[in-house]
Amino acid sequence: MKTSAAAHPDNSPDEMVEEIDLAGNVLQLVTRRKMRAEGLCHRSVFIAVMSEKGDLLVHQRAATKDIWPSWFDVAVGGVVAPGESWAVAAARELREELGIEGEPLEFLGTGAYRDGDVQLVAATFLCRTEGPFTFADGEITQAHWVSRAEIPVWLQGKQFLPDSVALVLPRLPE
């Protein structure tokens, strides 16, 4: 599955984001630019998409992404908007990134992640669907169904987002 890349308006550097503490308490509103530049903690959602036979949808991010451009990811997702619930953010990200609406989401849990690039508290969801997918927002350049047995091979051969690997893969059902 290949796509064309277009700029996504909601990823503007001037978009407002909630800076939070690790308990999830909102500290202040900051621009996305400031959040990225200073590595401020924020809320995110990850949605793993699995086929009925258990394959995982793995995708490559656009070169225009503000962090980890062109890297591969095991989940779609993004930053939670100010005042937005986890579930609403997850449904929005599925719609924006894959063109999926109305599919049930299974909540898999929350967790914190921190490295030298990013600091976040995220909710992880699972969506079981075969598609069809549309990549209209340009955040995804290609996508592949990957079996559970093939995931370790993919992880070793390509650059993957470390936050979703850490917070999503351990929560996936067997």
What role is predicted for each listed range?
Residues 57-58, 75-107, 125:
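The catalytic Nudix box helix
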Residues 15, 103, 120:
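Extended, polar beta-sheet/loop recognition surfaces of beta-rich domains
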Residues 44-76:
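A glycine-rich, hydrophobic loop/mini-helix early in the fold
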Residues 38-40, 67-71, 147:
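A short, polar/proline- and glycine-enriched secondary-structure boundary/capping micro-motif
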